[in-house]
């Protein structure tokens, strides 16, 4: 199933005029920030949805396909906002509050006001805008799928920058997710400033270091 505009069309029929899709990337990583994006699609997309046929849930696309989709979203979005919460704040707040903070920052950085939000499996307390929380929203709503692309590509680029600072961890390869390569690097070099020290196995490693 590919994302489409059926949910957006339902909201428009209820009288909402400007809709933003919101999604995040990096929630389950051992290292790096949580990045969220908010996307308002341009009116032409509602007239010609095929313009974004290349846009899908970011997890279903290759890196090359995501870059192509990213370019299309940039071209056919009325507004894009991005919010980034670094690893040390993920540790300080916890992953759920950090994710909501990133989403809120993305919403607040939009260049236009919105009437309703479509959010992938989440709600934003304190935001006085009608919200639709959609399970697997990035596979159902084109607005959320577009946000997932922006969030994922933005975060991947940040992790490529981190890789240039700390090449021994392989951030450019795994983007901070838990892989055997990442685990071996953690054991060999210990955590970097980009690592989330409250996440396993980073916490396990720190506990072992403290007890030795």
Swiss-Prot record:
Q: How is the cofactor bound?
A: Manganese or magnesium. Binds 1 divalent metal ion per monomer in the absence of substrate. May bind a second metal ion after substrate binding.
- State the protein's name: Ribonuclease HII
Supply one GO CC term from the record: cytoplasm
Q: Does the keyword NAD apply?
A: no
| Reaction equation(s) it catalyzes | Endonucleolytic cleavage to 5'-phosphomonoester
Cofactor(s) it depends on: Mn(2+); Mg(2+)
* Protein role: Endonuclease that specifically degrades the RNA of RNA-DNA hybrids.
Family, similarity comment: Belongs to the RNase HII family.
Question: In its keyword annotation, does this UniProt entry include Flavoprotein?
Answer: no
A biological process (GO) of this protein is: mismatch repair
Which Cys pairs does UniProt list as disulfide-bonded?
none
